[in-house]
Amino acid sequence: MSLPPLVEPASELTVDEVRRYSRHLIIPDVGMDGQKRLKNAKVLCVGAGGLGSPALMYLAAAGVGTLGIVEFDEVDESNLQRQIIHSQSDIGRSKAESARDSVKGINPYVNVILHEERLEADNVMDIFSQYDLIVDGTDNFATRYLVNDACVLLNKPYVWGSIYRFDGQASVFWSEHGPCYRCLYPEPPPPGMVPSCAEGGVLGVLCASIGSIQVNEAIKLLAGIGEPLVGRLMIYDALEMQYRQVKVRKDPNCAVCGDNPTVTELIDYEAFCGVVSEEAQEAAAGSTITPKQLKEWIDDGENIDIIDVREINEYEIVSIPGARLIPKNEFLMGSALENLPQDKKIVLHCKTGVRSAEVLAVLKSAGFADAVHVGGGVIGWVNQIEPDKPVY
């Protein structure tokens, strides 16, 4: 369905702007009016990472007048494989500042506003209220539900994207005209069930594919052209090079945008998404050791069995000496339990400690009462014990 333009047009374009945007201006559906609307638009991008990088660059190139960036992280070398708004010289810098500099380099006429803070329930309403449209470039479920609920409560549209390995998804959520994210995903998946990009990986160029689609949808909404992806989920398979669409209907029983909503104010989203399950938290309490403690046990010849619960491709990048690989899913399915020694202390680890805590809960319930896991995982080990090893 077509929707009216989201913003009013700016009063005029300068001679330099006409020259810059001339290839837009000669498109009948965009023209002078559409470009003026882009100039007058205020768009917020949540995140300057894999999706935020191409989104910000193309929004800037398109002539969106004001771009807000919510980002609190710093540029890491592992980001550069996909986060093309940053460069080698930006490693260690604020992502927000790095993104701002790239945006200004692409288009000096864009006004950039930085929000160098973590997006949370106590600041999201104030930040979002300053913008016409939100572009969601987040990679965790807690923030996705936060973005969705804030947009519903503020009646703001937002363009959503998701990436994992070779697969991508995109849609436009606007509860006034169609479904919201909760209509599609009423409940978050169990903690640890869906790996993040840091755990499962992502093809770098996939970020550009989905990020560009997000910008395309943003331009359509701002200028009031075409049919935005409201009520439609676009699914992209990069390996098969296939696009398909699934219709998504507004759920009358949706907790936030339904006929009788139960979520009428923002909640604790990390608790809602169970960033670490209660079982894992309980299991880890009193059963977490540091990388330095593990190093002491190894040096002292303690009778331990170090088990890495990551995936094999992660194990091949970097591992703790003496650790053997048993992926998390083998524990969740129960197949790994029978092969565990009864006469050794089990020491679990993963990348950062989240997955190993989940496995620890499984072992505790199976009777391995003295099992422990390494807080901080292999990343903590590298940082504290073997800093010359690679991280990812």
Regions of interest found by a model, annotated:
Residues 2-6, 107-121, 125-213, 223, ...:
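E1/E1-like adenylate-forming module used to activate ubiquitin-like modifiers
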Residues 38, 127-132, 340-341:
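A short, aliphatic-rich alpha-helical micro-motif
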Residues 46-47, 70, 349:
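Conserved N-terminal Rossmann-fold NAD(P)-binding element of oxidoreductases
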Residues 3-5, 101, 238-252, 256-304, ...:
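Rhodanese-like catalytic fold shared by cysteine-dependent sulfurtransferases
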Residues 212-230:
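Oxidoreductase and adenylate-handling cofactor-binding alpha/beta cores
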Residues 51-52, 355:
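Hydrophobic/small residue at the entry helix of a nucleotide-binding pocket
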Residues 4-12, 69-107:
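Glycine-rich phosphate-binding loop and adjoining beta1-alpha1-beta2 segment
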Residues 1-44, 77-78, 266-268, 272-282:
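N-terminal charged helix/coil linker that caps or initiates catalytic domains
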